[in-house]
Swiss-Prot record:
Protein name: ATP-dependent RNA helicase CHR1
Lineage: Eukaryota, Fungi, Dikarya, Ascomycota, Saccharomycotina
GO biological process terms, semicolon-separated: maturation of SSU-rRNA
Organism per entry: Candida albicans (strain SC5314 / ATCC MYA-2876) (Yeast)
Protein localization: Nucleus, Nucleolus
Motif (Q motif): 131-159
Motif (DEAD box): 286-289
């Protein structure tokens, strides 16, 4: 069912039946039939707009009040479908998870999932979460929480990282977006803390750092899920409210076992002496390429100086880890193991990537409107831009097109951003416009399309942006608009597309583009391209507006000049009188 077709339907009168039949009151049977039809239509619309599957729907599209054959057949077909799904589920459950016991088993597993693990004394990966019962005596409550939330089978990054972490090894992990990295570090972190019997108010033992508040909130939500019912562990996110309570000595930080935080807020509390990081046993840096970048590197370094426990274990996770970040990681770690799932600089193979040449800035808006007309604009959609000003401008343009759209950027408060994300996940917003503030980590499971309205400044930024779609093995699409000014900036993106196997998403002439020098790469990363304003206002109207503005400015200038002249005249007259 095409929801847009239903919403655009009109109404007409049947001329053949005559006026009396058109305006006659409906009978009881007709009313009931119409009611069933409306209910089924409403259910269909609800299901189609529930992009992220967060709502509860009626399983039967018809009520049981009628006694017709159609209702009976519908119920029977529903029962048959239910039986079929139960049978398939039962068959799936009968298939035993793979048991990995030897190095040969581990190598076969790694070849199958394109995993590369380097370092000394590499542990054998787990084949299932049940493997952890025998090998690591996983807490039963944690295991049941995983199963209850349908985390039945571990992903390749989880299979590799969990045994490495539980063997107390430092870790550098790189895996595609949407591959389950959050659980890959949360499960062993929680398991190690629960396995040690320590006194209450011992102090913070686990610290997770993330670059954005949105990502920190998401990590904390996952942490709450797997620790539900575990009374001996206390977890928290360092929110503005909690930071205030700690700084005012209302609460002591020693009551928490695990803290999730962004760097600046954590540093502020630590500097005031209201949080002790000296007892931390496990430090996890999520989105490490961002936190070791020039914007966050000093903050990350300051946090590391306060983590003074000699037995501390460090882990870094990201979808992209450049060689410069690896070098920095090696300098702060002890004999780390390195996991690469897939290619180091590639995007998920579930994402269909495409480069679209638009000529100029106006061409980008025309391209979006063309996508809408051709039915390629299937919500939910995320559109990325390079600046807040441009995000706001596009928001107003798409509002003019009467699209169900909202915008997120750094100028909006955390509460406003949370509300927009919630509405987007519920399907109330179909198109979300944003800057790179949402490019990392935030998990939207049902996003169909990502549009890079502005070309990202690096291959890493591109991988993280398009990683908002194609998550958890689902198919997704990513479209990047580029203009004549982006001829050099698209080269890193082209390399990512090649490594991901998306050779049909760009024109063949792009193959002949030369390699970028180090100087050119640095310039692209550090200097944003100066772009024209986002607007579809005709040139004639723009000129008229400019003329009017110039006239107003000239009028104001003349008034000021006349005032100054009159003041000078009055001053000279006063002098003469004296």
């Amino acid at each position: 069912m095409d929801i847009f077709r239903i919403l655009s339907r009109g109404a007409s009168l049947n001329k053949k039946k005559g006026i009396t039949t058109d305006y006659a009151l409906p009978s009881e049977k007709q009313t009931q039939k119409q009611k069933h039809k409306q209910e089924s239509l409403l259910n269909e619309v609800e299901r189609e707009t529930d992009f992220f599957h967060t709502r509860k729907h009626n399983s039967n599209s018809t009520t049981t009040s009628g006694k017709g054959d159609k209702l009976t057949n519908g119920a029977n077909s529903n029962k048959e479908e239910q039986m079929e799904t139960n049978e398939t589920k039962a068959k799936e459950e009968e298939i035993p998870p793979p048991e990995l016991t030897t190095e040969e088993d581990a190598q076969t597993f790694r070849n199958l999932h394109k995993s590369k693990v380097t370092g000394d004394d590499i542990p054998i990966p787990i084949g299932s979460f049940q493997d952890m019962i025998g090998r690591f005596h996983i807490n039963k409550k944690v295991l049941s929480n995983l199963i209850d939330n349908e985390f039945v089978e571990p992903t390749p990054i989880q299979c590799e990282s969990i045994p490495i972490t539980l063997n107390n090894r430092d870790l550098i992990a790189c895996a595609p977006t949407g591959s389950g990295k959050t659980l890959a570090f949360l499960i062993p972190l929680v398991q190690q803390i629960l396995s040690k019997n320590v006194s209450k108010n011992h102090g913070i033992r686990g610290l997770i750092i993330s670059p954005t508040n949105e990502l920190a909130v998401q990590i904390f939500q996952e942490l709450e899920i797997i620790t539900r019912g575990c009374k001996q562990i206390n977890v928290a996110i360092l929110s503005k409210q909690l930071a205030s309570k700690l700084n005012n000595n209302i609460i002591k930080s020693s009551k928490y076992d695990i803290i999730v935080s962004t760097p600046l807020r954590l540093i502020d509390v630590v500097k005031q002496g209201n949080m002790d990081l000296s007892k931390i046993e496990q430090l996890i840096i999520d989105e490490a390429d961002k936190l070791f970048d020039h914007g966050f590197a000093e903050q990350t370094d300051e946090i590391l100086t306060h983590c003074t426990n000699p037995k501390i274990r460090k882990s870094i996770f990201s979808a992209t880890i450049p060689s410069s970040v690896e070098e920095m990681a090696h300098s702060i770690m002890k004999d780390p193991l390195r996991i690469i799932i897939g290619h180091k600089e590639a995007a998920s193979n579930t994402i269909d990537q495409k480069l679209v040449f638009t000529g100029n800035e106006q061409g980008k808006l025309l391209a979006i409107r063309q996508m809408i007309q051709q039915g390629e604009f299937k919500p939910p959609i995320i559109i990325f831009l390079q600046s807040i000003t441009r995000a706001k401008a596009l928001f107003h343009e798409l509002l003019y097109d009467r699209l169900n759209v909202d915008v997120i950027h750094a100028e909006r408060t955390p509460k406003q951003r949370e509300e927009v994300i919630k509405r987007f996940k519920n399907g109330d917003i179909w198109v979300l416009i944003t800057t790179d503030v949402l490019a990392r980590g935030v998990d939207f499971k049902g996003v169909n399309l990502v549009i890079n309205y502005d070309v990202p400044q690096s291959a890493q930024a591109y991988v993280h942006r398009i990683g908002r779609t194609g998550r958890g093995g689902k198919a997704g699409k990513a479209v990047t608009f580029f203009t004549k000014e982006d001829d050099k900036a698209i080269k890193p993106i082209l390399n990512v597309m090649k490594q991901s196997g998306c050779n049909d998403g760009y024109s063949q002439w792009m193959e002949d583009m030369g390699k970028l020098s180090k100087k050119e790469k640095k310039q692209i990363k550090t200097h944003e391209i100066q772009r024209k304003k986002i607007s579809t206002v005709p040139k004639v109207i723009k000129q008229k507006r400019k003329q009017r503005q110039d006239m107003i400015a000239a009028s104001k200038r003349r008034k000021q000049e006349s005032k100054q002249e009159s003041k000078q005249e009055s001053h000279s007259n006063d002098e003469r009188e004296e």
